[in-house]
């Protein structure tokens, strides 16, 4: 199985090195090969927005997050960042009819659906209406939209 990591999962992965990550998330991460883990360009955007926001408020923490982003996230996912292309955009549009959902989440879900992947997230409720397969590593079980 291949996975698209939501922003909250990538953020949690940062905590593993310092022993502050949720134990279920850390265990799940150890159970999968890194080559199976992807991010959407939307996740990269959300992470960058977060770093920029913190840099404006707290220089020290912002610097640490900037280093994490530039030395870990971007290099680690350089070959595993999925773009929002025409096919993903069209699939995202379909997810908005008849129930409008958050566009960022819909783009991540559409990316996973187009590529036949599961979304890994803590925000299960945000993705359930899309029909994408969801894995919550905090609970480490797969949810489907029929649950």
Language-model features, listed with the residues they occupy:
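Short secondary-structure boundary/capping segments
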Residues: 1, 27-30, 72-73, 81, ...
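Active-site neighborhoods of divalent-metal-dependent phosphate/nucleic-acid chemistry enzymes
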Residues: 49-54, 63, 75-120, 147
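Short, flexible helix/strand-to-coil boundary loops that buttress conserved ligand/catalytic motifs
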Residues: 14-17, 51, 96, 131, ...
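Acidic active-site catalytic centers that drive phospho-/nucleotidyl reactions
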Residues: 6-8, 46, 105, 123
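Acidic, PIN/NYN-like endoribonuclease modules and their adjacent C-terminal/linker elements
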Residues: 1-2, 109, 113-147
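Short, well-structured N-terminal submotif of metal-dependent ribonuclease cores
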Residues: 1-39, 53-70, 141-147
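Conserved beta-strand termini and adjacent loop/short-helix elements that scaffold enzyme active sites
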Residues: 40-42, 84-86, 122, 137
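A generic structural signal for short hydrophobic patches within well-formed alpha-helices
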Residues: 10, 44-47, 89, 127
